[in-house]
Amino acid sequence: MYLVTVRIKREGDKPINEQHLVEAVSLTDVDTKIRREFSGVDADITSCKVINFTEVFENGEGWFYEIKNEIETLDSKKVVELYLQEASDDRLAREYFRNEVGDGEMISFVKKPYYGIIR
């Protein structure tokens, strides 16, 4: 799953950014699905991040965490992971984060909507 920011320019309007969750197997697959979803509209992908979570939240709102995890890759780099957690308030969301991630260092924690799931 990828969290994709799409810059959309509709005729006569200022460009807007929308975030969509995209079920895809690769970045090429993400690009294909976004182009299909926004065919006929001036739309560009401005960012794309892999996102890890166990459930897909259909209501379009969740708590996003960017986490620097102490996982070493083959080239000895630390991994930055993005998680999505649905919670009714900030306190619960942070509690879920600590239970789920444990020792990871939280580098951002925000609540924001996404606009839909593109399959």
Segments and roles (model prediction):
Residues 1-17:
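Short, extreme N-terminal segment that most often corresponds to the first beta-strand
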Residues 5-8, 92, 117:
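Intrinsically disordered, low-complexity sequence elements enriched in Ser/Thr/Gly/Pro
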Residues 8-12, 26, 69-73, 86:
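Beta-strand elements of well-folded, non-transmembrane domains
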Residues 15-26, 77-89:
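A short, exposed loop/beta-hairpin motif centered on an aromatic-Gly-Thr core
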Residues 17, 36-73, 80, 99-119:
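Short, mixed-charge low-complexity intrinsically disordered segments
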Residues 24-38, 85-102:
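Short, well-ordered alpha-helical segments
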